Amino acid sequence: MSDNYVALLGTKGGPAIRPGSSMPTSNLVVMSGQHILLDCGLGVTKGIVDQGMALKELSLIFISHMHSDHYLELGPLLHTAWTAGLKTKVTVYGPKGLDAYWDGFLASMKADIDLRIEDEGRPDLRNLLDIHVIDADKVYEQSGLTVSALRTEHPPLIDCFAFSFKTAAKHVVFSGDTAPIKALEDFARGADLLIHEAMLESALPALMTRIGNGSDKLMTHWLRSHTFAHDAAKTATQAGVKRLALSHLIPSDDPTYGPKDWQDACADHWSGELIVGGDGIKIEL
């Protein structure tokens, strides 16, 4: 295994899980000697340890936007890491609203946190997180790694970001949640790997039926705020990236659709290596 890789911890688009589905969005980026989390959907904690990483080694997290499938387990992850030995600060970069989420989580767990400090002698969890609100442009730079953000088109949210992770030798881009936008082509120009969200157009009506408690507004959201697989393929081609991986898959739990359907959806617009995401997949850089 290379010293630089991406692990797709959770590859499902949307917050719900059903029998046979993958888990919501989370990713582990290992570059320039750093282990970085991007998004913390449900299941991220187990996803990390399944990759062989100790939770107490957490240090840097990026959150793309304030939809629950991207940050729901941030609080439980940090609390579990704390009980697993975390004693150094974790830095989180994300949109406005994360601080309110964290304050609410701490308030909900106050009795347990106070008890473990008193009864077990642990450091105060409330002092172990630094949150930085991000905007587009360069977000982070350290040890030869530069992380940049691009605001995407994901209405009704305004603060939703794609991320670029770049060293002198490697370049990885995550689309974040977005409708197709020209700016992402420039942002991902020449990247070694583009990880792009994707939907299968023909599968959406059946998914609406399975969900059962959404109105036509949900379909409207998908169509205006996300990207079909064939459009992700077009973006990858226009950006001149070396490899394309599909993640945040909608749907991820319909047994009538498999990897070939995703490959067929991209075939007319992408001729390079295509990776159809699955939970736990490691992609070497």
Task: Describe the function of each predicted region.
Residues 162, 171-173, 179-278:
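Cap/insert and terminal regions of metallo-dependent hydrolase folds
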Residues 1-179, 184-186, 260-284:
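Binuclear metal-dependent hydrolase catalytic cores
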